[in-house]
């Protein structure tokens, strides 16, 4: 089975607190953000896949631990919900910036 990895905020916090942030060019900062965002989305996808695999194995009778399957499913659900909320906040912030007059 694949090991479950969680999406954590410290990756972003450590980058924001380091003094090397000021040394990045805008292109490097975009690439760093792109990599962090891509990694977070991949982690959400991995959780969804593990949940689907365990659910399928439970349905086939190969796993008898319903408790583990339910916990895995809830972790995937909560992570996806948090990701959707973050996306909504990013879109809201973008729309607010676009409404600003220059």
UniProtKB/Swiss-Prot annotation:
An example Pfam family from this entry, by short name, is FliE
Identify the GO cellular component terms for this protein: bacterial-type flagellum basal body
MF-aspect GO terms: cytoskeletal motor activity; structural molecule activity
Which cell locations does it reside in? Bacterial flagellum basal body
Give the UniProt record's GO annotations in the biological process aspect: bacterial-type flagellum-dependent cell motility
Q: What is its main location?
A: other
Keyword Chloroplast tagged: no
> Which keywords does the record carry?
Bacterial flagellum
Signal peptide annotation: none
- Give the record's family classification: Belongs to the FliE family.
Name under which the protein is recorded: Flagellar hook-basal body complex protein FliE
Task: Provide the gene name from the record.
Answer: fliE
């Amino acid at each position: 089975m694949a090991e479950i990895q969680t999406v954590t905020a410290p990756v972003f916090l450590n980058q924001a607190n380091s003094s090397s942030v000021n040394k990045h060019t805008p292109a490097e900062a975009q690439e760093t953000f792109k990599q962090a965002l891509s990694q977070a989305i991949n982690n959400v996808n991995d959780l969804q896949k593990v949940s689907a695999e365990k659910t399928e194995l439970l349905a086939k009778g190969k796993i008898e631990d319903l408790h583990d399957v339910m916990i895995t499913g809830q972790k995937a659900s909560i992570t996806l919900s948090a990701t959707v909320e973050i996306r909504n906040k990013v879109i809201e912030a973008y729309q607010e910036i676009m409404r600003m007059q220059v």
